[in-house]
């Protein structure tokens, strides 16, 4: 495809509804906040948040190629993939082994396509049973990424007992954060290797 600005990096952020900022009255979500704090004077970005409510890793396996193929130019180094992993696998009862395999398959294919990938793990909810699964899932996702040298932002452990996160969830539906919660995720991403992954100076 064409039509972009000269020298821009195109970033597809594929995941669940959190990548689209559901629950944020400002409509920025964590993706918009990260982009707003990313220097673009010398390296412009075109960022495409592509969220589906309750998305699972199986859904991502089926979807990510189609989403990226329609938005990326076939120019080496000009495209990036971000995976925003959510609670979908836990709610759908997907086994930990299958979740690991699904993520591994995406990362391996992206690597074969020379497509740099950045992974953001699932944040906690207010439901203890769901959090039990998310705690294990986040650790598993982190391990899969670590084995492949892919940057992984753990959103679960830093927020599990974070007062501002829990207060923000409590003010909403208990699952989707508001402005404060998305700001916390954005902070974790920005301090989790984001600039280095894009090749930008902080």
Show where each model-derived region lies.
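Glycine-rich phosphate-binding loop signature in dinucleotide/nucleotide-binding domains
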Residues: 70-78, 113-114, 196-198
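Serine-esterase "nucleophile elbow" of acetyl-processing enzymes
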Residues: 1-53, 58, 65-75
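Short, solvent-exposed loop/turn segments at secondary-structure boundaries
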Residues: 22-27, 93-97, 128-133
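Glycine-rich anion/phosphate-binding loops
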Residues: 58-65, 94-104
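Active-site segments of SGNH/GDSL-like serine hydrolases
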Residues: 84-88, 106-138, 162
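Catalytic His-Asp segment of secreted/periplasmic serine-dependent ester chemistry enzymes
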Residues: 124-202
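Cell-envelope and extracellular/periplasmic
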Residues: 50-55, 83-90
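Structural motif
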Residues: 10, 79-82, 116
């Amino acid at each position: 495809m064409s039509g972009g600005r000269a020298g821009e990096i195109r970033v597809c952020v594929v995941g669940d509804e959190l990548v689209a900022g559901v629950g944020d009255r400002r409509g920025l979500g964590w993706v918009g906040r990260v982009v707003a704090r990313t220097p673009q004077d010398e390296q412009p970005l075109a960022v495409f948040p592509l969220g589906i409510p309750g998305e699972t890793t199986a859904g991502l396996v089926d979807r990510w190629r189609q989403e990226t193929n329609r938005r990326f130019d076939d120019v080496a180094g000009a495209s990036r993939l971000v995976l925003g992993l959510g609670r979908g696998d836990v709610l759908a009862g997907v086994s930990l082994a299958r979740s690991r395999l699904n993520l591994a398959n995406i990362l391996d294919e992206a690597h074969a396509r020379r497509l740099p990938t950045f992974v953001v793990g699932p944040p906690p909810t207010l439901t203890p049973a769901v959090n039990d699964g998310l705690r294990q899932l986040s650790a598993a996702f982190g391990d899969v990424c670590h084995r492949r040298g892919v940057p992984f932002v753990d959103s679960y452990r830093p927020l599990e007992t974070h007062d501002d996160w829990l207060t923000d969830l409590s003010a909403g539906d208990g699952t989707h954060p508001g402005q404060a919660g998305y700001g916390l995720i954005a902070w974790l991403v920005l301090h989790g290797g984001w600039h280095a992954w894009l090749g930008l100076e902080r």
